[in-house]
Swiss-Prot record:
It comes from Escherichia coli (strain K12). The lineage of its organism: Bacteria, Pseudomonadati, Pseudomonadota, Gammaproteobacteria, Enterobacterales. InterPro entries: Biofilm_formation_YgiB. GO terms for biological process: single-species biofilm formation. This is UPF0441 protein YgiB. Residues 204-223 have a biased composition (Polar residues).
């Protein structure tokens, strides 16, 4: 009988511990999950140029100029490239395209292209840029160029998009938003030309994926 009592007491202690530690474990797990969410998102500001940034951040003029210039260089490297001005204008609108420097990430696909001089490709103008803290907690700032179309027929019309076609809402500088940290990561260099309308298709696909992800997240949170 003594042995039976000791077994029951041990079982009781085990069950009591499980019942009372479970909420604590859940609370700890929740804290870690929230911490993970905080680390995966970042608040960024959207500016059209260095002057906009400087006006919004007194005393940070040098940082704003550096971020803007870095964004321009990144735009040259990652922006969609077109073989002709007409293809670029059809996507982004009149007055929204410029010749791309020959060294801006493009590799000649054939001998004819290799013989062409600087400016043989066309790319959209940088419409603005995102600016946020460096990943890893550095003291500097990270930046990401943004593009926008003025052609009403384009899926990128009136929107800020990055080089991959991801949509960041209306092309209105001076606002802040929360984005995944991956949004500020460097994008791959553009090494081939885009066909007419190709970038718009990328924007449309990305927008569909974003809406789908948002809907799935809302349903999950709603149970």
């Amino acid at each position: 009988m003594k042995r039976t009592k000791s077994i029951r007491h041990a079982s009781f202690r085990k069950n009591w511990s499980a019942r009372h530690l479970t909420p604590v474990a859940l609370a700890v797990a929740t804290v870690f999950m929230l911490a993970g969410c905080e680390k995966s998102d970042e608040t960024v500001s959207l500016y059209q140029n260095a002057d906009d940034c400087s006006a919004a951040n007194p005393g940070k003029s040098a940082e704003c100029t550096t971020a803007y210039n870095n964004a321009l260089k990144e735009a040259e490297r990652t922006a969609p490239k077109y073989a002709t001005r007409e293809d670029c204008v059809a996507e982004f609108g009149e007055g929204q395209c410029q010749q791309a420097p020959a060294q801006a990430g493009m590799a000649p696909e054939n001998q004819a292209q290799a013989q062409q001089s600087s400016g043989s490709f066309w790319m959209p103008l940088m419409a603005g840029y995102m600016m946020g803290r460096l990943m890893g907690g550095g003291a500097g700032f990270a930046q990401q160029p943004l593009f926008s179309s003025k052609n009403p027929a384009s899926p990128a019309y009136g929107k800020y998009t990055d080089a991959t076609g991801k949509n960041y809402g209306a092309a209105q500088p001076g606002r802040t938003m929360t984005v995944p940290k991956t949004a500020m990561a460097p994008k791959p260099a553009t090494t081939t030309t885009v066909t007419r309308g190709g970038f718009g298709e990328s924007v449309a696909k990305q927008s569909t994926m974003q809406r789908s992800a948002t809907g799935t997240s809302s349903r999950s949170m709603g149970g």
